[in-house]
Amino acid sequence: MFILLVLVTGVSAFTTPAVVHTGRVSESPVTSEKHPVLGDDCWFRGRDFKSELRLEGEPVVLRCPLVPHSDTSSSSRSLLTWSKSDSSQLIPGDEPRMWVKDDTLWVLPAVQQDSGTYICTFRNASHCEQMSLELKVFKNTEASFPLVSYLQISALSSTGLLVCPDLKEFISSRTDGKIQWYKGSILLDKGNKKFLSAGDPTRLLISNTSMGDAGYYRCVMTFTYEGKEYNITRNIELRVKGITTEPIPVIISPLETIPASLGSRLIVPCKVFLGTGTSSNTIVWWMANSTFISVAYPRGRVTEGLHHQYSENDENYVEVSLIFDPVTKEDLNTDFKCVATNPRSFQSLHTTVKEVSSTFSWGIALAPLSLIILVVGAIWIRRRCKRQAGKTYGLTKLPTDNQDFPSSPNQIKEMK
Protein backbone atom coordinates (compact mmCIF):
# COMPACT_ATOMS: atom_id res chain seq x y z
CA MET A 1 0.00 0.00 0.00
CA PHE A 2 2.87 2.36 0.70
CA ILE A 3 4.25 1.81 -2.82
CA LEU A 4 0.82 2.50 -4.33
CA LEU A 5 0.47 5.72 -2.31
CA VAL A 6 3.87 6.99 -3.50
CA LEU A 7 3.09 6.22 -7.14
CA VAL A 8 -0.35 7.88 -7.02
CA THR A 9 1.31 10.96 -5.54
CA GLY A 10 3.73 10.92 -8.49
CA VAL A 11 0.80 10.91 -10.93
CA SER A 12 -0.65 14.07 -9.38
CA ALA A 13 2.74 15.75 -9.68
CA PHE A 14 2.99 14.88 -13.38
CA THR A 15 -0.43 16.25 -14.30
CA THR A 16 -0.04 19.91 -13.37
CA PRO A 17 -1.70 22.35 -15.82
CA ALA A 18 0.37 23.52 -18.78
CA VAL A 19 1.61 27.11 -18.72
CA VAL A 20 1.38 29.32 -21.81
CA HIS A 21 4.22 31.79 -21.88
CA THR A 22 2.90 35.29 -22.32
CA GLY A 23 5.96 37.31 -21.89
CA ARG A 24 9.64 37.43 -22.75
CA VAL A 25 12.49 38.17 -20.34
CA SER A 26 14.50 39.99 -23.02
CA GLU A 27 11.77 42.62 -23.39
CA SER A 28 12.35 44.11 -19.94
CA PRO A 29 12.86 47.88 -20.31
CA VAL A 30 14.74 48.08 -17.02
CA THR A 31 18.51 48.18 -16.98
CA SER A 32 18.96 48.69 -13.24
CA GLU A 33 18.47 46.05 -10.58
CA LYS A 34 15.62 46.25 -8.11
CA HIS A 35 16.40 48.16 -4.94
CA PRO A 36 14.07 49.32 -2.17
CA VAL A 37 13.07 52.94 -1.79
CA LEU A 38 14.08 54.26 1.63
CA GLY A 39 11.16 54.58 3.98
CA ASP A 40 8.81 52.61 1.77
CA ASP A 41 7.82 48.99 1.36
CA CYS A 42 7.85 49.22 -2.45
CA TRP A 43 10.63 47.97 -4.69
CA PHE A 44 11.81 50.64 -7.10
CA ARG A 45 12.59 49.06 -10.48
CA GLY A 46 14.25 52.16 -11.93
CA ARG A 47 13.32 54.50 -14.76
CA ASP A 48 11.87 53.41 -18.08
CA PHE A 49 14.42 53.77 -20.87
CA LYS A 50 11.92 55.59 -23.10
CA SER A 51 10.96 59.23 -22.51
CA GLU A 52 7.64 60.53 -23.82
CA LEU A 53 8.23 63.65 -25.96
CA ARG A 54 4.98 65.39 -26.89
CA LEU A 55 3.61 68.69 -28.19
CA GLU A 56 1.52 71.13 -26.19
CA GLY A 57 -2.23 71.01 -26.83
CA GLU A 58 -2.25 67.36 -27.92
CA PRO A 59 -3.44 64.23 -26.06
CA VAL A 60 -0.81 62.29 -24.12
CA VAL A 61 -1.07 58.71 -22.86
CA LEU A 62 1.48 57.33 -20.40
CA ARG A 63 1.55 53.54 -20.09
CA CYS A 64 2.86 52.01 -16.87
CA PRO A 65 5.92 49.89 -17.77
CA LEU A 66 5.28 47.64 -14.75
CA VAL A 67 2.27 46.00 -16.38
CA PRO A 68 4.20 43.45 -18.51
CA HIS A 69 6.07 42.36 -15.36
CA SER A 70 3.16 42.26 -12.92
CA ASP A 71 0.25 41.56 -15.29
CA THR A 72 -2.25 43.76 -13.45
CA SER A 73 -4.99 42.81 -15.90
CA SER A 74 -4.98 39.25 -14.54
CA SER A 75 -5.67 40.19 -10.94
CA SER A 76 -8.85 41.85 -9.72
CA ARG A 77 -7.18 42.58 -6.37
CA SER A 78 -4.28 44.58 -7.79
CA LEU A 79 -4.10 48.36 -7.45
CA LEU A 80 -2.28 50.68 -9.86
CA THR A 81 -1.79 54.32 -8.86
CA TRP A 82 -0.01 57.32 -10.38
CA SER A 83 1.84 60.24 -8.82
CA LYS A 84 4.31 62.93 -9.82
CA SER A 85 7.76 63.09 -8.28
CA ASP A 86 7.30 66.70 -7.15
CA SER A 87 3.99 65.99 -5.40
CA SER A 88 2.72 63.47 -2.85
CA GLN A 89 -0.83 63.76 -4.20
CA LEU A 90 -2.17 60.89 -6.27
CA ILE A 91 -3.23 61.57 -9.85
CA PRO A 92 -5.72 62.63 -11.10
CA GLY A 93 -6.70 64.46 -7.91
CA ASP A 94 -8.58 67.66 -8.79
CA GLU A 95 -7.07 67.98 -12.29
CA PRO A 96 -9.86 67.48 -14.89
CA ARG A 97 -7.33 67.13 -17.72
CA MET A 98 -5.97 63.90 -16.23
CA TRP A 99 -7.58 60.54 -15.62
CA VAL A 100 -6.53 56.90 -15.19
CA LYS A 101 -7.76 54.21 -17.58
CA ASP A 102 -6.64 50.62 -16.93
CA ASP A 103 -2.82 50.75 -16.87
CA THR A 104 -2.55 54.17 -18.58
CA LEU A 105 -2.59 57.81 -17.49
CA TRP A 106 -4.36 60.18 -19.90
CA VAL A 107 -3.52 63.88 -20.17
CA LEU A 108 -5.76 65.88 -22.48
CA PRO A 109 -4.75 68.40 -23.58
CA ALA A 110 -1.14 68.48 -22.39
CA VAL A 111 0.56 71.70 -21.32
CA GLN A 112 4.25 72.42 -20.77
CA GLN A 113 3.75 72.42 -16.99
CA ASP A 114 2.89 68.70 -17.23
CA SER A 115 6.55 67.93 -17.96
CA GLY A 116 8.28 65.94 -15.25
CA THR A 117 8.80 62.51 -13.73
CA TYR A 118 5.74 60.32 -13.21
CA ILE A 119 5.71 57.28 -10.94
CA CYS A 120 3.34 54.35 -11.30
CA THR A 121 2.92 52.09 -8.28
CA PHE A 122 1.60 48.55 -8.46
CA ARG A 123 0.31 46.86 -5.32
CA ASN A 124 -1.36 43.57 -4.55
CA ALA A 125 -1.67 41.31 -1.53
CA SER A 126 1.89 40.01 -1.82
CA HIS A 127 4.13 42.84 -2.99
CA CYS A 128 4.53 46.44 -4.18
CA GLU A 129 6.61 47.79 -7.08
CA GLN A 130 7.33 51.25 -8.47
CA MET A 131 8.75 52.57 -11.72
CA SER A 132 9.24 56.06 -13.13
CA LEU A 133 8.99 57.53 -16.61
CA GLU A 134 9.73 60.96 -18.06
CA LEU A 135 7.31 63.25 -19.89
CA LYS A 136 8.53 66.32 -21.76
CA VAL A 137 5.96 68.64 -23.34
CA PHE A 138 7.27 71.14 -25.91
CA LYS A 139 5.71 74.22 -27.42
CA ASN A 140 3.80 73.31 -30.58
CA THR A 141 5.95 75.09 -33.16
CA GLU A 142 8.05 73.93 -36.11
CA ALA A 143 11.17 74.69 -34.09
CA SER A 144 10.17 71.90 -31.69
CA PHE A 145 9.67 69.24 -34.37
CA PRO A 146 13.32 68.04 -34.39
CA LEU A 147 13.15 67.66 -30.59
CA VAL A 148 10.19 65.26 -30.70
CA SER A 149 11.11 63.30 -33.83
CA TYR A 150 11.39 59.54 -34.18
CA LEU A 151 14.47 58.45 -36.11
CA GLN A 152 13.79 56.00 -38.94
CA ILE A 153 16.31 54.76 -41.50
CA SER A 154 15.95 53.57 -45.07
CA ALA A 155 18.55 52.16 -47.45
CA LEU A 156 19.32 53.84 -50.73
CA SER A 157 17.48 52.44 -53.79
CA SER A 158 15.27 50.22 -51.63
CA THR A 159 11.58 50.44 -50.71
CA GLY A 160 11.47 52.56 -47.60
CA LEU A 161 8.87 52.23 -44.85
CA LEU A 162 7.65 55.03 -42.58
CA VAL A 163 5.65 54.08 -39.50
CA CYS A 164 3.46 56.54 -37.58
CA PRO A 165 4.29 55.40 -34.02
CA ASP A 166 2.55 55.30 -30.64
CA LEU A 167 -1.08 55.54 -31.77
CA LYS A 168 -2.39 52.33 -30.20
CA GLU A 169 -4.53 54.06 -27.57
CA PHE A 170 -6.14 56.41 -30.10
CA ILE A 171 -7.08 54.01 -32.91
CA SER A 172 -9.88 51.51 -32.41
CA SER A 173 -9.84 50.52 -36.09
CA ARG A 174 -6.72 51.29 -38.11
CA THR A 175 -8.54 50.79 -41.38
CA ASP A 176 -10.84 53.68 -40.45
CA GLY A 177 -8.13 55.92 -38.99
CA LYS A 178 -7.75 59.27 -40.74
CA ILE A 179 -4.05 60.02 -40.98
CA GLN A 180 -2.45 62.59 -43.24
CA TRP A 181 1.21 62.47 -44.18
CA TYR A 182 3.42 65.53 -44.74
CA LYS A 183 6.99 66.02 -45.83
CA GLY A 184 7.97 69.21 -44.11
CA SER A 185 4.85 71.37 -44.52
CA ILE A 186 3.75 69.80 -47.85
CA LEU A 187 0.82 67.38 -47.79
CA LEU A 188 1.69 64.19 -49.67
CA ASP A 189 -0.70 63.42 -52.50
CA LYS A 190 -2.30 59.96 -52.27
CA GLY A 191 -1.95 59.60 -56.04
CA ASN A 192 1.79 60.19 -55.90
CA LYS A 193 3.61 57.11 -57.23
CA LYS A 194 6.60 57.93 -55.05
CA PHE A 195 4.67 57.50 -51.81
CA LEU A 196 2.43 54.43 -51.65
CA SER A 197 -0.20 53.33 -49.18
CA ALA A 198 0.54 50.05 -47.41
CA GLY A 199 -3.13 49.33 -46.70
CA ASP A 200 -2.56 50.50 -43.14
CA PRO A 201 -2.86 54.31 -42.72
CA THR A 202 -0.13 54.23 -40.06
CA ARG A 203 2.40 53.04 -42.68
CA LEU A 204 3.76 54.75 -45.77
CA LEU A 205 5.97 53.14 -48.42
CA ILE A 206 8.62 55.10 -50.30
CA SER A 207 9.38 53.71 -53.74
CA ASN A 208 13.05 53.54 -54.77
CA THR A 209 14.37 55.62 -51.88
CA SER A 210 16.81 58.35 -52.89
CA MET A 211 18.95 60.78 -50.92
CA GLY A 212 16.38 63.48 -51.71
CA ASP A 213 13.78 61.58 -49.68
CA ALA A 214 15.69 62.21 -46.47
CA GLY A 215 14.25 64.81 -44.11
CA TYR A 216 11.42 65.40 -41.68
CA TYR A 217 7.97 63.85 -42.13
CA ARG A 218 4.79 64.29 -40.13
CA CYS A 219 1.78 62.07 -39.70
CA VAL A 220 -1.26 63.83 -38.26
CA MET A 221 -4.31 62.05 -36.88
CA THR A 222 -7.60 63.57 -35.71
CA PHE A 223 -8.86 62.31 -32.35
CA THR A 224 -12.32 63.17 -30.99
CA TYR A 225 -13.06 63.24 -27.27
CA GLU A 226 -16.39 64.42 -25.82
CA GLY A 227 -17.27 66.09 -29.11
CA LYS A 228 -14.01 68.03 -29.39
CA GLU A 229 -11.34 67.27 -31.98
CA TYR A 230 -7.63 67.12 -31.17
CA ASN A 231 -4.66 66.64 -33.49
CA ILE A 232 -2.13 63.94 -32.68
CA THR A 233 1.19 64.62 -34.39
CA ARG A 234 4.13 62.30 -34.76
CA ASN A 235 7.30 63.66 -36.34
CA ILE A 236 9.74 61.37 -38.13
CA GLU A 237 13.29 62.06 -39.21
CA LEU A 238 14.13 59.86 -42.19
CA ARG A 239 17.78 59.19 -42.86
CA VAL A 240 18.84 57.52 -46.10
CA LYS A 241 21.99 55.45 -45.98
CA GLY A 242 24.02 54.02 -48.81
CA ILE A 243 23.98 50.28 -49.28
CA THR A 244 26.38 48.66 -46.85
CA THR A 245 27.14 45.07 -46.03
CA GLU A 246 23.99 43.87 -44.33
CA PRO A 247 23.74 40.54 -42.53
CA ILE A 248 21.23 38.05 -43.87
CA PRO A 249 18.46 37.88 -41.24
CA VAL A 250 17.76 34.42 -39.86
CA ILE A 251 14.36 33.84 -38.26
CA ILE A 252 14.94 31.43 -35.37
CA SER A 253 11.47 31.48 -33.84
CA PRO A 254 8.53 30.85 -33.69
CA LEU A 255 7.96 27.12 -34.20
CA GLU A 256 5.77 25.81 -37.02
CA THR A 257 2.92 25.18 -34.57
CA ILE A 258 2.10 27.10 -31.39
CA PRO A 259 -0.02 25.30 -28.74
CA ALA A 260 -2.70 27.46 -27.13
CA SER A 261 -5.99 27.20 -25.27
CA LEU A 262 -9.07 28.93 -26.65
CA GLY A 263 -9.91 32.04 -24.65
CA SER A 264 -6.38 32.47 -23.30
CA ARG A 265 -3.97 35.35 -23.89
CA LEU A 266 -1.00 34.36 -26.01
CA ILE A 267 2.22 36.12 -27.02
CA VAL A 268 4.24 34.64 -29.89
CA PRO A 269 7.66 36.29 -30.35
CA CYS A 270 9.33 36.39 -33.75
CA LYS A 271 13.04 36.36 -32.97
CA VAL A 272 15.49 37.22 -35.75
CA PHE A 273 19.26 36.77 -35.62
CA LEU A 274 21.16 39.66 -37.24
CA GLY A 275 24.77 38.57 -36.93
CA THR A 276 27.56 39.71 -34.63
CA GLY A 277 29.09 43.12 -34.09
CA THR A 278 27.20 44.90 -36.88
CA SER A 279 24.22 47.22 -36.93
CA SER A 280 21.32 46.37 -39.19
CA ASN A 281 18.38 48.08 -40.90
CA THR A 282 16.27 44.92 -40.75
CA ILE A 283 12.52 45.46 -40.48
CA VAL A 284 10.34 42.76 -38.92
CA TRP A 285 6.57 42.48 -39.00
CA TRP A 286 3.73 39.94 -38.86
CA MET A 287 1.05 39.07 -41.41
CA ALA A 288 -2.15 37.02 -41.23
CA ASN A 289 -3.18 35.32 -44.48
CA SER A 290 -0.83 37.69 -46.36
CA THR A 291 -2.50 40.76 -44.78
CA PHE A 292 -1.05 43.25 -42.30
CA ILE A 293 -2.13 42.44 -38.75
CA SER A 294 -3.68 45.87 -38.20
CA VAL A 295 -5.81 45.39 -41.32
CA ALA A 296 -6.73 41.77 -40.62
CA TYR A 297 -7.78 42.59 -37.04
CA PRO A 298 -9.08 46.19 -37.07
CA ARG A 299 -10.61 45.85 -33.59
CA GLY A 300 -7.25 45.00 -32.08
CA ARG A 301 -7.91 41.49 -30.79
CA VAL A 302 -4.61 40.48 -32.39
CA THR A 303 -1.84 43.10 -32.42
CA GLU A 304 1.90 43.46 -32.94
CA GLY A 305 4.25 44.28 -30.09
CA LEU A 306 7.06 46.80 -30.15
CA HIS A 307 10.08 46.46 -32.44
CA HIS A 308 12.69 45.37 -29.87
CA GLN A 309 16.37 45.22 -30.87
CA TYR A 310 19.00 43.97 -28.43
CA SER A 311 22.32 42.11 -28.10
CA GLU A 312 23.25 38.89 -26.33
CA ASN A 313 26.91 37.78 -26.14
CA ASP A 314 27.80 40.21 -28.96
CA GLU A 315 25.05 38.70 -31.12
CA ASN A 316 22.36 41.06 -32.41
CA TYR A 317 18.70 40.16 -32.40
CA VAL A 318 15.39 41.84 -33.13
CA GLU A 319 12.00 40.68 -31.84
CA VAL A 320 8.43 41.59 -32.68
CA SER A 321 5.68 39.74 -30.83
CA LEU A 322 2.26 38.71 -32.08
CA ILE A 323 -0.26 39.22 -29.28
CA PHE A 324 -3.59 37.36 -29.10
CA ASP A 325 -6.09 38.69 -26.58
CA PRO A 326 -7.73 36.22 -26.59
CA VAL A 327 -7.16 33.18 -28.85
CA THR A 328 -10.30 32.18 -30.82
CA LYS A 329 -11.22 29.37 -33.24
CA GLU A 330 -10.65 31.76 -36.13
CA ASP A 331 -6.93 31.75 -35.33
CA LEU A 332 -6.69 27.97 -35.76
CA ASN A 333 -7.39 28.32 -39.50
CA THR A 334 -5.18 31.36 -40.09
CA ASP A 335 -1.75 31.33 -41.70
CA PHE A 336 0.47 33.63 -39.64
CA LYS A 337 3.78 34.73 -41.09
CA CYS A 338 6.75 36.57 -39.63
CA VAL A 339 8.61 38.65 -42.21
CA ALA A 340 12.15 40.01 -41.90
CA THR A 341 13.68 42.13 -44.63
CA ASN A 342 16.64 44.40 -45.27
CA PRO A 343 18.40 45.63 -48.43
CA ARG A 344 20.22 42.32 -48.71
CA SER A 345 17.58 39.68 -48.07
CA PHE A 346 13.90 38.88 -47.55
CA GLN A 347 12.97 36.08 -45.14
CA SER A 348 9.66 34.74 -43.87
CA LEU A 349 8.50 31.97 -41.55
CA HIS A 350 4.98 30.54 -41.35
CA THR A 351 3.35 29.36 -38.15
CA THR A 352 -0.08 28.16 -37.06
CA VAL A 353 -1.91 28.10 -33.74
CA LYS A 354 -2.95 24.64 -32.55
CA GLU A 355 -5.59 24.11 -29.90
CA VAL A 356 -4.60 22.27 -26.74
CA SER A 357 -7.77 20.34 -25.88
CA SER A 358 -6.84 19.47 -22.32
CA THR A 359 -4.03 20.08 -19.89
CA PHE A 360 -4.38 16.45 -18.68
CA SER A 361 -2.12 14.03 -20.54
CA TRP A 362 -3.31 10.43 -20.62
CA GLY A 363 0.15 9.39 -21.74
CA ILE A 364 1.67 10.78 -18.57
CA ALA A 365 -1.05 9.21 -16.41
CA LEU A 366 -0.81 5.74 -17.98
CA ALA A 367 2.95 5.54 -17.51
CA PRO A 368 2.77 5.43 -13.66
CA LEU A 369 -0.27 3.13 -13.92
CA SER A 370 1.77 0.68 -15.98
CA LEU A 371 4.51 0.89 -13.37
CA ILE A 372 1.99 0.05 -10.63
CA ILE A 373 0.87 -3.03 -12.56
CA LEU A 374 4.50 -4.14 -13.00
CA VAL A 375 5.26 -3.70 -9.29
CA VAL A 376 2.14 -5.61 -8.20
CA GLY A 377 2.94 -8.34 -10.73
CA ALA A 378 6.51 -8.60 -9.46
CA ILE A 379 5.30 -8.94 -5.85
CA TRP A 380 2.83 -11.67 -6.84
CA ILE A 381 5.48 -13.61 -8.81
CA ARG A 382 7.93 -13.35 -5.90
CA ARG A 383 5.41 -14.73 -3.42
CA ARG A 384 4.47 -17.56 -5.78
CA CYS A 385 8.13 -18.50 -6.25
CA LYS A 386 8.55 -18.64 -2.45
CA ARG A 387 5.64 -21.06 -2.16
CA GLN A 388 7.04 -23.30 -4.94
CA ALA A 389 10.44 -23.29 -3.26
CA GLY A 390 8.88 -24.39 0.05
CA LYS A 391 7.15 -27.37 -1.55
CA THR A 392 10.35 -28.49 -3.30
CA TYR A 393 12.29 -28.29 -0.04
CA GLY A 394 9.77 -30.56 1.72
CA LEU A 395 9.99 -33.22 -1.00
CA THR A 396 13.80 -33.41 -0.95
CA LYS A 397 13.86 -33.83 2.82
CA LEU A 398 11.55 -36.87 3.03
CA PRO A 399 14.16 -39.60 2.20
CA THR A 400 16.50 -38.39 4.96
CA ASP A 401 13.79 -39.08 7.57
CA ASN A 402 13.71 -42.84 6.72
CA GLN A 403 15.75 -44.75 9.39
CA ASP A 404 16.07 -47.94 7.26
CA PHE A 405 18.94 -46.40 5.32
CA PRO A 406 22.29 -45.79 7.00
CA SER A 407 23.39 -42.20 7.06
CA SER A 408 27.10 -42.98 7.24
CA PRO A 409 29.45 -45.54 5.61
CA ASN A 410 30.66 -46.54 9.11
CA GLN A 411 27.26 -47.93 9.93
CA ILE A 412 27.36 -50.48 7.07
CA LYS A 413 28.11 -53.98 8.31
CA GLU A 414 29.23 -56.89 6.21
CA MET A 415 26.68 -59.67 5.90
CA LYS A 416 27.93 -63.12 6.53
Curated annotation (Swiss-Prot):
**Topological domains annotated Extracellular:** 14-355
Record GO cellular component, one term? plasma membrane
Residues with glycosylation annotation: 124, 208, 231, 289
Q: Which residues form the Ig-like C2-type domain?
A: 29-136, 146-233, 249-357
Primary location group: membrane
UniProtKB keywords: Cell membrane, Disulfide bond, Glycoprotein, Immunoglobulin domain, Membrane, Receptor, Repeat, Secreted, Signal, Transmembrane, Transmembrane helix
Q: Where in the cell is it found?
A: Membrane; Cell membrane; Secreted
Gene Ontology MF: a single term: interleukin-1 binding
Which biological process, per GO, is one annotated for this protein?
cell surface receptor signaling pathway
Top-rank taxon of the source lineage equals: Eukaryota
Q: Which InterPro entries match?
A: Ig-like_dom, Ig-like_dom_sf, Ig-like_fold, Ig_sub, Ig_sub2, IL-1_rcpt_fam, IL-1_rcpt_I/II-typ, IL-1_rcpt_II-typ
Entry comment on modification after translation: A soluble form (sIL1R2) can also be produced by proteolytic cleavage at the cell surface (shedding) involving a metalloproteinase.
Q: Which Pfam families match?
A: ig (PF00047)
Q: Where is this region: Disordered?
A: 396-416
Query: Which regions span the lipid bilayer?
Result: 356-381
Q: What are the boundaries of the signal sequence?
A: 1-13
Family classification: Belongs to the interleukin-1 receptor family.
Record protein name field: Interleukin-1 receptor type 2
Taxonomic path:
Eukaryota, Metazoa, Chordata, Craniata, Vertebrata
